[in-house]
Regions:
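Conserved "HGTGT" condensation-loop signature of ketosynthase/thiolase-family condensing enzymes
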Residues: 1-179
Length: 179
């Protein structure tokens, strides 16, 4: 794991690494242990960003995340509970995470974010397209503190990527908003 180019030493890999990062960055949110891997990844990424930027930094922000895999891990887990007719026991705790926007709900609640949240599924990570979409959204945003945006993808419990940043409004001399 790395934050702002600084490596964070860890003793675990895969989804266990997320739990280790959670314990070192913030251990006061017991719901973390009920989350799916995608939500844990987003949660830890936002915790590390908040820690780097300062307490309360995220509350006045919108959030726009991108990924390719949507909520495939939870989708597969849920499918496993409904595939066999005689063993049809779907659970709400699994089903809720088949909605990929739930990860944004988890971090928005945690950081008291009052702005808009969006998850956009892309065929692949495309930094240019993502920047264009963030810029367009910020032109219409009413959130004073900008937008948390980036790539959060989790195709497998042991293979995932999170890269997020805060994009700030920059009001230049003619009143136009730049990002």
């Amino acid at each position: 794991a790395e934050v702002d180019g600084t490596s964070i030493p860890l003793s675990c890999n895969g989804k266990d690494m997320l739990t280790e990062l959670y314990r070192t960055s913030s251990s006061d949110y017991p719901r973390f242990y009920r989350m799916d891997v995608l939500s844990r990844l987003a949660f830890v990424a936002f915790e590390l960003l908040q820690k780097a930027m300062g307490e309360g930094t995220l509350s006045g922000c919108d959030a726009m995340l991108f990924n390719h895999s949507s909520s495939i891990l939870s989708d597969r887990k849920h499918q496993g509970t409904i595939s066999v007719p005689g063993e049809f026991f779907p659970g709400p705790a699994t089903f809720v995470y088949t909605l990929p926007n739930v990860m944004l709900g988890e971090v928005a609640i945690r950081h008291d974010m009052k702005g808009a949240t969006s998850l956009i599924i892309l065929p692949e990570k495309d930094s240019t397209l993502m920047s264009q979409m963030v810029y367009a959204a910020m032109l219409k945003s009413s959130c004073p503190d900008g937008m948390v945006a980036g790539w959060i993808d989790c195709p497998d419990e042991n293979e995932f990527e999170a890269e997020i940043s805060i994009y700030k409004h920059n009001h230049n001399n003619n009143g136009r908003t730049d990002t």
